[in-house]
């Protein structure tokens, strides 16, 4: 059973703090192994990647067969049902339309002194996308990562996906084609991250790597950071639902289980001011668990990390929700706008009873790559801006240099940087 908390209980704060502090993911100590793999890939390039792929994925490759070819994309198209392809296309189009609105504008202006300032936005030239492999890999994640990159103007989107025993989900290939992925390689693990970061004879390096992966992939991303950029260190999925008593408990239970079925370490939580609804939701969760194909996974998640929190009123839930800073926040109340105004920390917010979080996973248009493990307190979900760089622009003419130069010289001398001061003074004949 999920943990049950009542805000009116004397030990509520201690138990709530323990809920926040609970560690949901056991990190394997893989840094040493990953460091060895990365060094090997950096030294031996293609051959190291091929050797590790044979060892871990049981797939013999050559430099010529690292890339997925057009014949395989064509076969994947034939293997995917028309209605599924149409759904992927709808999702792609909605993601593209929403992310087009995120594109920033260049800014140039001249201030009162006549100094010209501004900012210029340019796309990262090459981005790598890691997609977990096997038949359980998610085509929606391909769209969520690759489409914003292409909207940003990235010239070269390179996708890597492990194919254990040669198996790859055809939906992933179709999604890659729809999203505009430029290159796709059948490699995974830390060795794929190394190939993207350092490059090989077959795979030119990229400048940033995005996408989720296991402990080895996460460690590899951490270790190559600085050589390349990375997106975020994502953990298990989570949802928090703020609900009033007028909700259908079966709807809420379905939303909770939609997160719980992801992973035994996923977390599904609900806050309500109605104890009777809390009871009904718990009962509905138990009923629905018996019918789910991934019921065993969802049951473990609900048992170990689920939470039902009864608050004095929904306004009192807001400070608690902001402390949780959930990846996904559903506001399932009659009038959600006042509560929405008080939300400071959440990866994404789903407003009203008719907006289940799952719509955001697939076809809403907003991005489902979101901060987890309370990192929504200081970070945002994936967007077009993650694939762009802002460069400052400054121009001073002779008059502006005469006006500003003496102050620059004074500050440079105060910092003991004589060459800095001379750089300005020499232009002013000082």
Language-model segments: what does each one mean?
Residues 323-430:
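C-terminal core of ALDH-fold dehydrogenases
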Residues 155-164, 268-274, 279:
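Short internal beta-strands
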């Amino acid at each position: 059973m999920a943990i049950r908390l009542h805000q009116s209980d004397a030990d509520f704060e201690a138990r709530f703090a323990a809920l926040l502090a609970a560690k949901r993911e056991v990190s394997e100590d893989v840094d040493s192994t990953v460091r060895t793999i990365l060094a090997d890939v950096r030294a031996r390039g293609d051959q190291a990647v091929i050797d590790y792929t044979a060892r871990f994925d049981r797939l013999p490759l050559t430099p010529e067969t690292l890339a997925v070819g057009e014949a395989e994309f064509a076969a994947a198209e034939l293997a995917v049902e028309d209605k599924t392809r149409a759904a992927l296309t709808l999702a792609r189009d909605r993601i593209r339309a929403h992310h087009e609105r995120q594109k920033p504008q260049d800014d140039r202006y001249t201030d009162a002194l006549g100094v010209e300032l501004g900012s210029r936005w340019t796309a990262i030239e090459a981005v790598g996308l890691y997609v977990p492999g096997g038949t359980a890999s998610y085509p929606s994640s391909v769209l969520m990562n690759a489409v914003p990159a292409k909207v940003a103007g990235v010239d070269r989107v390179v996708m890597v996906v492990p194919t254990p025993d040669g198996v790859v989900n055809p939906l992933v290939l179709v999604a890659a084609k729809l999203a505009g992925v430029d290159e796709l390689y059948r490699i995974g693990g830390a060795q794929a991250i190394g190939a993207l970061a350092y490059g090989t004879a077959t795979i030119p390096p990229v400048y940033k790597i995005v996408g989720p992966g296991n402990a080895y992939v996460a460690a590899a991303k951490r270790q190559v950071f600085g050589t390349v950029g990375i997106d975020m260190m994502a953990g298990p999925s989570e949802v928090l639902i703020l609900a009033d008593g007028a909700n259908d408990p079966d709807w809420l239970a379905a939303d909770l289980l939609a997160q719980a079925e992801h992973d035994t370490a996923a977390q599904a939580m609900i806050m309500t001011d109605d104890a009777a609804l809390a009871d009904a939701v718990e009962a509905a969760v138990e009923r629905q668990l018996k019918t789910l194909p991934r019921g065993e996974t969802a049951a473990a998640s609900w048992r170990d990390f689920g939470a039902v929190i009864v608050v004095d009123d929904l306004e009192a839930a807001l400070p608690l929700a902001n402390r949780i800073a959930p990846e996904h926040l559903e506001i399932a109340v009659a009038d959600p706008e006042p509560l929405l105004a008080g939300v400071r920390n959440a990866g994404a917010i789903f407003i009203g009873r008719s907006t289940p979080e799952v719509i955001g996973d697939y076809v809403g248009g907003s991005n489902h790559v979101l901060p987890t493990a309370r990192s929504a307190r200081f970070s945002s979900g994936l967007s077009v801006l993650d694939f762009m760089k802002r460069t400052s622009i400054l121009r001073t003419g002779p008059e502006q240099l005469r006006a500003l130069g003496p102050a620059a010289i004074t500050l440079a001398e105060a910092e003991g940087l004589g060459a800095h001061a001379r750089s300005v003074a020499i232009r002013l004949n000082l």
